[in-house]
Amino acid sequence: MPELPEVETVRRGLQPAMEGFRIDRAVAHRENLRFPLQKDFVARLTGQTVTGLGRRAKYLLADLSSGDVLLMHLGMSGSFRVVEADGETRPGEFHYPRSEDRTHDHVVFEMASGARVVFNDPRRFGFMKVFPRSEIETEPHLKGLGPEPLGNAFDASLLAKACAGKQTSLKAALLDQRVVAGLGNIYVCEALFRAHLSPKRKASTLANRKDEPTDHAVRLTEAIREVLGEAIKAGGSSLRDHRQTSGELGYFQHAFKVYDREGEPCPTCGGTVQRFVQNGRSTFWCPKCQK
């Protein structure tokens, strides 16, 4: 599933095609995605101008001139492409594998510029929803999300307080969207490696007895920001179904230090990268230098 860097890359790719333009026509070729599209989905989009295109965690959020918000989630295999008025596909700046099978083109936005923004999703785990901007604080998919890891509010103190007293593993805590929004398995593994912290370590060790941040929390916060920032700059990770809107493959996976590198030498200490299953997911780490 695309994580924060992939979704942010998609947002940046769609922004020049959607932001500031009117949706002349919305077409739903298939209404039963992960969740059924609302009966008034097409009507609430048609004729509205996209006044802003943002992101919250792994969700894309398009503000509409009507006061509504269009929430979009890529799911496991969802992708966007932009077909310009001249018929040439120039989907933006991002990298993520998308299906070439047009039978999976489920939703199309025909923009006033003449461009067509097409959502393709073979597995249909993605979804879209329109709701009033006034309800954004209570929207079930957004309610309770933690801070954005690249936002100004996210720092070692905030992370330490969120993890204080937690007896769960550090990796499990970071994957909890209530603790930090948008982090997924790939970048948690990479951030823990950079911070030299074991994924098995208790989350509570990020805070001292006064719930103040320990050195572990400081190192981890910096590592999270670095890993995410580098991944966004590289265009995200092209694993399985992820690609940029331009159709180009991303290349951040080539910078992975431990993820999907089981049995390879650790680039830091020369030890061996190992894999084990943690909370139903593969964890990659170096037991020698992650403590």
UniProtKB/Swiss-Prot annotation:
Q: Which reaction does it catalyse?
A: Hydrolysis of DNA containing ring-opened 7-methylguanine residues, releasing 2,6-diamino-4-hydroxy-5-(N-methyl)formamidopyrimidine; 2'-deoxyribonucleotide-(2'-deoxyribose 5'-phosphate)-2'-deoxyribonucleotide-DNA = a 3'-end 2'-deoxyribonucleotide-(2,3-dehydro-2,3-deoxyribose 5'-phosphate)-DNA + a 5'-end 5'-phospho-2'-deoxyribonucleoside-DNA + H(+)
Q: Where are the zinc fingers (FPG-type)?
A: 257-291
Q: Which CDD domains match?
A: EcFpg-like_N
Top-level taxon in the UniProt lineage: Bacteria
Name its co-factor(s).
Zn(2+)
For this protein, the record's Pfam families field holds:
Fapy_DNA_glyco, H2TH, zf-FPG_IleRS
Q: Which residues form the active site?
A: 2-3, 58, 281
| DNA repair as UniProt keyword | yes
List the InterPro entries. Answer: DNA_glyclase/AP_lyase_DNA-bd, DNA_glyclase_Znf_dom_DNA_BS, Formamido-pyr_DNA_Glyclase, FPG_cat, MutM-like_N-ter, Ribosomal_uS13-like_H2TH, Znf_DNA_glyclase/AP_lyase, Znf_FPG/IleRS
SUPFAM superfamilies documented for this protein = Glucocorticoid receptor-like (DNA-binding domain), N-terminal domain of MutM-like DNA repair proteins, S13-like H2TH domain
Q: What is its EC number?
A: 3.2.2.23, 4.2.99.18
Q: How is the cofactor bound?
A: Binds 1 zinc ion per subunit.
User: Which residues does the record give as DNA binding sites?
Assistant: 104, 123, 166
The protein's UniProt keywords, in alphabetical order, are: DNA damage, DNA repair, DNA-binding, Glycosidase, Hydrolase, Lyase, Metal-binding, Multifunctional enzyme, Zinc, Zinc-finger
**Signal peptide as annotated in the record:** none
Q: Subunit notes for this chain?
A: Monomer.
User: Per its UniProt record, what HAMAP family does this chain match?
Assistant: Fapy_DNA_glycosyl
Sequence similarity? Belongs to the FPG family.
Q: Report the protein's function.
A: Involved in base excision repair of DNA damaged by oxidation or by mutagenic agents. Acts as a DNA glycosylase that recognizes and removes damaged bases. Has a preference for oxidized purines, such as 7,8-dihydro-8-oxoguanine (8-oxoG). Has AP (apurinic/apyrimidinic) lyase activity and introduces nicks in the DNA strand. Cleaves the DNA backbone by beta-delta elimination to generate a single-strand break at the site of the removed base with both 3'- and 5'-phosphates.
Protein name per the record: Formamidopyrimidine-DNA glycosylase
Q: What taxonomic ancestry is recorded?
A: Bacteria, Pseudomonadati, Pseudomonadota, Alphaproteobacteria, Hyphomicrobiales
